[in-house]
UniProtKB/Swiss-Prot annotation:
It comes from Neisseria meningitidis serogroup B (strain ATCC BAA-335 / MC58). This is Ribosomal RNA large subunit methyltransferase K. CDD domains: AdoMet_MTases. GO terms for biological process: methylation; rRNA processing. The keyword Cytoplasm applies. Belongs to the methyltransferase superfamily.
Amino acid sequence: MASYDKISDGWYRVCPKRSSNRALITVKLPFSTLFRLKPMTDITPFANRLGKNIKHLMKWAKRNGIEAWRIYDRDIPQFPFAADVYGDRIHLQEYDTGWLMRPEEYEAWLAEVLEAVAFVTGFAPEQIRLKRRERQKGLQQYEKTGKAGDDFVITENGRKFWVNLDKYLDTGLFLDHRNTRKKVGETAAGKRFLNLFSYTGSFTVYAATGGAASSETVDLSNTYLDWAKRNFELNGIDTERHKIVRADVFQYLQTAYGEGRRFDLIVMDPPSFSNSKKMSDILDIQRDHKKLIDGAVKLLASDGILYFSNNLRSFVLDDLVSEQYAVKDISKQSVPEDFRNKKIHRCWEIRHKS
């Protein structure tokens, strides 16, 4: 159960206990004014939208060999959820809205949502994993939930990946980058590939299985590099030609350039912010992206391509980047069909100017 802190007559903060296996709401008051959310007692609009999305996307997912795909993307504001199919399970994320609700109203509302998801999808309740995403800075994908869960394999475009819906806030595979992964796989043949801020190495899996001559997969987290290694093994990737490198990306860029290493294809998908103690400095992508892009382009072959992406909503690409390099915004093409929110990330194709 959660703890309830009384604010005033009839109003409460709902705070989850760490041991709870349900994701309950935590309300922070940004202003002195309180406001009520009109309870959405009718679950029908949510259920109908969920059913409509599944009907539209299920054949598409099967046709494309995709076992992990989004079936609901905060389509209706009163139901602020993202729901993803992962094989025979559902990953359901509730987003923090700052709403104030009475405890009993919230519990009833959440139970209705879960019941609707189970009914419409046909998945058993125990196959649905519920999480709550708070508004906060930092490397959310590196944060543990306190649950162990189990690892299992899903398939995407003929590649296999280990995922875990319980242990971390993120699952091990960012579904919104599916299109860019596919593009990398289609263009990597014979090329030297570099994956920066690699997370679990999914871009490298596409590059290696797409015929890349060699690759380097760079991240600072041992946990996620071990995960990447398992993904490589799952797809029969030779770790002699496709190396895994634990390093601070800023330091790696300097070292690799000094050693004369060059790459034909680079992917860089950094977090918006990181204060990891393992890094030499705090990463702020708005402040630091020009330095990162400059360092990556130095490693590009004359006809090479850098794909640079991030998910900071307020992000603005430095004008100097477009002045110095040939830059193409490919954000629209990079967001998959199953994502309603076409601003979930931004992505650019960056080359040397001819």
